[in-house]
């Protein structure tokens, strides 16, 4: 996970900096809603490439999804480690058992 943590740190270092100096700073300056919108766009592009069965393009879009996911997390002050903690808690649970254990509503 070092690469993702390094990317997270780079993204966090762009928070509050001049939006004209980097794409990340520009995206973060537009707020969490814009960051979420961009994440959604990238996820759709990844889905399209998965359906087309183009592995190279899917890998490229997957990288975009991971980057924009980290930007979206940063925009809401959620750490990657918070997400990893949830994944670790779910590890070993069947997907059906985990879903059934979620609070209703």
Curated annotation (Swiss-Prot):
CDD domains in the cross-refs: NTP-PPase_HisIE_like
Pfam families named in the record: PRA-PH (PF01503)
Enzyme Commission designation: 3.6.1.31
InterPro entries in UniProt: HisE, PRib-ATP_PPHydrolase-like
Catalytic activity: 1-(5-phospho-beta-D-ribosyl)-ATP + H2O = 1-(5-phospho-beta-D-ribosyl)-5'-AMP + diphosphate + H(+)
Molecular function terms, GO-annotated: ATP binding; phosphoribosyl-ATP diphosphatase activity
Subcellular location per the Swiss-Prot or TrEMBL entry: Cytoplasm
Similarity-based family: Belongs to the PRA-PH family.
Protein name as it appears in the record: Phosphoribosyl-ATP pyrophosphatase
Native source organism of the sequence: Ruegeria sp. (strain TM1040)
Lineage: Bacteria, Pseudomonadati, Pseudomonadota, Alphaproteobacteria, Rhodobacterales
């Amino acid at each position: 996970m070092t690469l993702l943590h390094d990317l997270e740190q780079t993204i966090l270092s762009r928070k509050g900096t001049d939006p004209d100096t980097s794409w990340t700073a520009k995206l973060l300056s537009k707020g969490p809603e814009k960051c979420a919108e961009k994440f959604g766009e990238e996820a759709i592009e990844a889905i399209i490439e998965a359906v087309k069965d183009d592995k190279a393009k899917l890998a490229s879009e997957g990288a975009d999804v991971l980057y924009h996911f980290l930007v979206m997390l940063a925009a809401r002050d959620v750490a990657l480690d918070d997400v990893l903690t949830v994944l670790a808690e779910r590890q070993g649970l069947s997907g059906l058992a985990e879903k059934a254990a979620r609070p209703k509503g």
